[in-house]
Amino acid sequence: MEKDKSFLGTQPVGKLLFKLSLPTVIAQIVNMLYNIVDRIYIGHIPGDGSLALTGVGVCLPIIMIISAFAAFVSAGGAPRASISMGKGDNGSAEKILGGCFSMQIVISAVLTALLLIFDRDLLLAFGASENTIEYAVDYMNIYAIGTVFVQLTLGMNAFITAQGFANIGMVTVMIGAVSNIVLDPIFIFGLHMGVRGAALATIISQCISCVWVVAFLFGKKTILRLKAKNFFVSPKIILPCITLGLATFIMQSSESVISVCFNSSLLKYGGDIAVGAMTILTSVMQFAMLPLNGISQGSQPILSYNYGAGNSERVKKTFKLLLAVCLTYSFLLWGLIELFPQGFARMFSSDAALIDFTAHALRIYCAVLCLFGIQMSCQMAFVSIGSALCSISVAVVRKFVLLLPLIYIMPAFVADKTMGVYMAEPVADVIAITFTSILFTIQFGKAMKKLEAQKKGETK
């Protein structure tokens, strides 16, 4: 990879997007295995696999919050670093990198303390029952210790990708994923540790990835380097980053809030089997979202660099290509889920009743997944050009204005109240995608006209 980032403004957009997105997509697919391999193994533990899977599923909202805090800093910091580099200001970009690194360590310490102190109370509030609470506590107590590894791996890897080192970003994920896949069966079955073994395998794998990421950013191959002189949390540097990252934080942390609401409603109407099915649905949706995230993240350095350089034509061309690729993927995945839902369910459980229940719920829950590429493309474009307010608006409308109330409203309109809870997802998505499309058409057009006007002013 070139040390000079000007290639982001000169190489053909299609070739460049493919070169940056493919490694990231591969990394996200591998990362999907990293995230769900625990659940696959746990769901097949002899005797109590279904309850253990449900217990670990209750931990997912907390795991989402941990990941969301990594994005809170890096999802805004990485694009701002790219924009600074597009302007030729690598010094400011390195200050952003160093400040975000320190901020994530502080956040990790706070989260770890809170999770270890309030683990049982949080898990009960998040939908654990008397049958599943012990499995959830066993998993979370160990996972919480590795919070700092999650924060630094996810957060700092975003800065690696933002510099155009997509291959290095892919290796980061693959190191952790392969380690987890190898260690899981050893700890779960070989050492008979059950869910505790799954959690231990996960944090060891995250530690290995963390060492790789930090070593790279301290090394000589990176464009932006971690330097001790930049390890201070300056409001002037951090506040713009977390403002821009707030939309991604809301998107990811709201998944946790939504998961809690889903779990509580499903426990009320359908019992443990409905919550267990939700664990599988969440895993399948991660499968759907992670490659889309990978494609979007591959486009971010191109969009941000060219926006910073004032090249509106390349920004528009990159977005159109991003939208086409995301929609194509969304349609293909939607078709597979609707045609073969039981195949996805069998990946996570051997319980026939849970498989049948999940297959029916999956078709409802993913009914409009085919259109979600629009949402992801517009969201990334807003973030890449530094449009924090629009990014936040899109995130808030979909999750809090629409989905959250619909979880409680939809059961009142259908006879099968459990399936009514699942129906909230597609109904919210249709409305949210419509809103996002309208907002994007207006605001992105304004941003491009402003960029073109600035460019004309500079050439006079």
Please identify what each model-predicted range represents:
Residues 33-36, 44, 50, 84-87, ...:
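Helix-loop interface residues and adjacent transmembrane-helix termini in multi-pass membrane transporters
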Residues 53-113, 150-169, 277-335, 339-341, ...:
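Small-residue-rich hydrophobic transmembrane alpha-helices
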Residues 74, 143-161, 169-177, 198-211, ...:
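Short runs within selected transmembrane alpha-helices of multi-pass transporters and secretion channels
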Residues 1-24, 81-148, 192-245, 303-368, ...:
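Short alpha-helical transmembrane segments in multi-pass integral membrane proteins
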Residues 36-40, 113, 155-159, 178-186, ...:
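Alpha-helical transmembrane segments of multipass membrane proteins
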Residues 31, 35, 39, 43, ...:
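Juxtamembrane/transmembrane-helix interface segments of polytopic membrane transporters
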Residues 19-20, 58, 181, 243, ...:
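Hydrophobic alpha-helical transmembrane segments of integral membrane proteins
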Residues 25-79, 143-150, 239-306, 326-334, ...:
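Transmembrane helix-bundle signature of multi-pass secondary active exporters and lipid flippases
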